[in-house]
Each structure stands twice: as structure tokens, then as C-alpha cells.
């Protein structure tokens, strides 16, 4: 059977050339983070956001700005077109619709007056109907109700 043995290189057994390691050179990072001496209470959200600017590369910032400006320009032009179209439609509606509505109302009035005149004409024909040998409307009504003529009440 084969046996494996670990052979260490002499190079790794000697200490490396360089400054001596001293544990006092290193400090606890937790204590540095918790120190509030660097905290500015006057720092605003925009200051913090502006400080993050260096974390994003200039090409990425340019790409985001291009997308932002393209989107805002599209929204502005769309809203501008929609406003102008709404103005044109409403003014056209007022210039055409109001006179049309007035003319339509007048036409309805004329039609109602003509119908009323025809009804009066028919009503007068019915009341005065009858020729020679025919009884008038009053006589027909009196005969229908079976009444005699009017008598004075004493």
C-alpha cells in the first residue's frame, strides 16, 4: 500500500522578509464605525445622494440621464399635444354646436306651433261640424247622454 507523507518546503519554514507584524497596528473596525465624530447632523438627503454620485460610473449616469430626458420630453410633448387637441375640439364644438342647438330649438318651436295650429283647426272643424240636416256637436253630445235641454233650477 502507498503511504502519503507531507513534505514542507524550506522556503515556507523561514519567516518572510519585511516589517515585523505587530498586532497593535491593527485596530478594531467596529469601534471606528461607531464613532460619531464624522457624523454631520446638517447633512441633507440631497447631500447624501450627491455623495453617491461617485459610486456610479459616468457612462451609466449618462445612460440614465439620456433615458430620463427622453422620457420627460415624450411626456411633455404628449401632454402639450393633448391640451392643444382638447382646446381645438372644445372651441370647434362651441362654434358649431351652439348655433346648431339654437337652430334645432327654433325648428322644434316652429313644429310645435304648426301642430298646435292644426289641432285648433281640427278642433274648430269638429265643433262647427255639421251641415244641413245634420245635428251639431252640442246636439250629438246631448243626445248621447240622454238628457234634455238645460232647465232653470227653481
UniProtKB/Swiss-Prot annotation:
* Organism superkingdom: Eukaryota
Stated membrane topology is:
Single-pass type II membrane protein
Q: Which GO terms describe its cellular component?
A: mitochondrial outer membrane translocase complex
**Per the record, what ranges lie on the membrane's Cytoplasmic side?**
1-84
Q: Main localisation, per the record?
A: mitochondrion
- Give me the segments passing through the membrane: 85-105
CDD domains for this protein: TOM22
Q: Which UniProt keywords apply?
A: Membrane, Mitochondrion, Mitochondrion outer membrane, Protein transport, Receptor, Translocation, Transmembrane, Transmembrane helix, Transport
Q: Relate the protein's function as given in its record.
A: Central component of the receptor complex responsible for the recognition and translocation of cytosolically synthesized mitochondrial preproteins. Together with tom20 functions as the transit peptide receptor at the surface of the mitochondrion outer membrane and facilitates the movement of preproteins into the translocation pore. Docks tom20 and tom70 for interaction with the general TOM40 import pore (GIP) complex. May regulate the TOM machinery organization, stability and channel gating.
Domains as described in the record: Its cytoplasmic domain associates with the cytoplasmic domains of tom20 and tom70. Its intermembrane space domain provides a trans binding site for presequences and the single membrane anchor is required for a stable interaction between the GIP complex proteins.
Q: Which family does it belong to?
A: Belongs to the Tom22 family.
Q: What is this protein called?
A: Mitochondrial import receptor subunit tom22
Origin species, per record, is: Neurospora crassa (strain ATCC 24698 / 74-OR23-1A / CBS 708.71 / DSM 1257 / FGSC 987)
Chain's gene name: tom22
Amino acid at each position: 500500500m502507498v503511504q502519503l507523507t507531507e513534505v514542507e518546503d524550506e522556503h515556507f519554514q523561514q519567516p518572510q522578509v519585511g516589517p515585523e507584524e505587530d498586532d497593535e497596528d491593527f485596530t478594531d473596525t467596529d469601534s471606528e464605525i461607531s464613532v460619531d465624530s464624522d457624523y454631520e447632523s446638517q447633512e441633507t438627503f440631497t447631500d447624501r445622494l450627491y455623495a453617491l454620485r461617485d459610486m456610479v460610473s459616468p457612462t451609466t449616469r449618462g445612460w440614465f440621464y439620456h433615458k430620463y430626458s427622453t422620457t420627460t420630453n415624450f411626456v411633455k410633448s404628449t401632454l402639450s399635444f393633448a391640451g392643444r387637441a382638447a382646446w381645438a375640439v372644445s372651441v370647434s364644438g362651441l362654434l358649431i354646436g351652439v348655433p346648431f342647438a339654437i337652430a334645432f330649438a327654433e325648428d322644434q318651436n316652429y313644429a310645435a306651433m304648426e301642430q298646435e295650429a292644426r289641432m285648433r283647426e281640427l278642433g274648430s272643424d269638429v265643433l262647427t261640424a255639421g251641415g244641413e240636416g245634420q245635428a251639431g256637436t252640442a246636439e250629438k253630445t246631448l243626445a248621447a247622454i240622454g238628457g234634455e235641454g238645460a232647465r232653470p233650477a227653481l
